[in-house]
């Protein structure tokens, strides 16, 4: 497919979070023509979302704001509100054509290199009652806080594990919001397993302890809990959980869940990129070389979309990918590329040091959702239906579509794929990495017939 007005450029970057911004700055600095596409209204991704409008809140956000401003004064062309729905790699060489929707119209552009900086998504956390109105993710609530200054009030609870629950709780309290409580669902034994990696993660550990201290000084004592359930008729009204084996019930009209993040793989899967299993955090990530290039020539991945490492590491991986593109397209020689990349690699390793600690401390907990718990919200497929399909011989997620329609709804498996794989693997007595992942296909976003008709078949 191609569009009558197909543009041509050196590098197209999909996503304007830390990795995409850094790659854009680095690539334009070396003379590449850069087109940056992002579905949000402004640059920053999730971690620096709406930072231009609300201002920086700490030193890390100061650095992010400075990078965004550097990108804005560069020669990069930036398109916001651009939803990428297809990428067609060149058959004869690296690069490809990118198709996206913008202002209701389909557009396309060609590039010698395409960098995917699509970030991460929250890991699904299907507890009983998670589909009730009043239950949402911490990430979604944080977006509401950053973009619209909306904060929880009344009987609002945070539950789960990972740094985000502590950061968000502090942000809520500083913004004048109220919390009923925080449930820490992490594994107590994981603290001891993570201890050998703590020394290199001390700056982040101190930051986390400062957050927890601020939360406790506000009168909120986090509870270490298990067996969480959301309950209510038509909407959330209470939560039940266990603390030291004793069941407790609390009134709640908002429950915010979080169980870490995993790479967003919809585009890399659809492109046919190779992927490798990350055992500690139980997710797939694209295979990349030292410069971020995937197994599809000319298609690169950087940042959390190439493996969750956090914002600081994403910045350095984006800059390294930008250098790789500049060399591949003849703007700098190999010696210059390697010399400039060397300190970036060292800084990235420093940034990733704390990630090794966090990966063990907040390793995904093995869970066994009861048969009635919905796994696929779009098609209303329960854990019990997945187990029944396994008993009937279902061997992978693509077969599961035929058995149950799991993964065939509007989200195309983004919300259920990881959980469905875990349930199916356990039911079949297999490791999750042995379960065939979903075969994702383009279009990656909803597309109208009218938008599609604006494109014509290439002769």
Language-model features: locations:
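Residues forming the flavin
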Residues: 2-410, 414-459
């Amino acid at each position: 497919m191609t569009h009558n007005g197909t543009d041509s450029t050196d590098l197209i970057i999909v996503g304007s979070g830390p990795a995409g911004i850094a790659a854009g700055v680095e690539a334009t600095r070396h003379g590449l023509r850069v087109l940056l596409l992002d579905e949000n209204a402004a640059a920053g991704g999730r971690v620096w979302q709406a930072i231009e409008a609300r201002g920086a809140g700490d030193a890390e956000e100061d650095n992010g704001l400075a990078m965004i401003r550097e990108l804005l004064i560069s020669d990069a062309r930036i398109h916001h509100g651009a939803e990428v729905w297809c990428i067609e790699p060149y058959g004869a060489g690296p690069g490809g054509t990118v198709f996206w929707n913008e202002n209701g119209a389909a557009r396309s552009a060609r590039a010698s290199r395409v960098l995917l900086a699509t970030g991460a998504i929250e890991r699904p956390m299907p507890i009983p009652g998670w589909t009730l109105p009043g239950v949402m993710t911490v990430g979604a609530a944080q977006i509401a806080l950053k973009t619209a200054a909306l904060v929880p009030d009344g009987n609002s609870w945070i539950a789960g594990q990972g740094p985000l629950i502590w950061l968000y709780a502090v942000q809520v309290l500083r913004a004048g919001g109220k919390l009923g409580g925080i449930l820490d669902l992490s594994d107590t034994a994981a603290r001891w397993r993570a201890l050998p990696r703590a020394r290199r993660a001390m700056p982040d550990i101190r930051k986390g302890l400062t957050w927890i201290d601020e939360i406790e000084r506000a009168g909120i004592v986090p509870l270490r809990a298990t067996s969480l359930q959301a309950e209510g008729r038509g909407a959330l009204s209470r939560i039940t959980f266990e603390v030291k084996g004793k069941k407790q019930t609390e009134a709640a009209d908002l429950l915010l869940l979080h169980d870490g993040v995993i790479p967003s793989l919809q585009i890399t899967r659809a492109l046919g990129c190779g992927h490798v299993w990350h055992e500690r955090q139980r997710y797939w990530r694209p295979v990349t070389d030292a410069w971020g290039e995937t197994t599809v020539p000319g298609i690169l991945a950087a940042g959390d979309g190439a493996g969750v490492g956090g914002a600081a590491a994403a910045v350095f991986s984006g800059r390294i990918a930008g250098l790789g593109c500049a060399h591949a397209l003849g703007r700098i020689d190999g010696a210059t590329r390697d010399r400039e990349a060397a300190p970036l690699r060292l800084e990235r390793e420093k940034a990733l040091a704390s990630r090794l600690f966090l990966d063990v401390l907040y390793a995904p907990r093995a869970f066994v959702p009861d048969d009635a718990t919905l796994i696929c919200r779009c098609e209303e497929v329960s854990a019990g239906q997945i187990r029944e399909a396994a008993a009937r011989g279902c061997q992978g997620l693509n077969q599961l579509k035929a058995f149950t329609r799991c993964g065939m709804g509007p989200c195309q498996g983004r919300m259920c794929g990881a959980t469905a794989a875990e349930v199916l693997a356990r039911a079949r007595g297999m490791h999750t990495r042995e379960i065939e992942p979903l075969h994702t296909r383009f279009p990656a976003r909803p597309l109208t017939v009218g938008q599609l008709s604006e494109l014509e078949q290439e002769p």
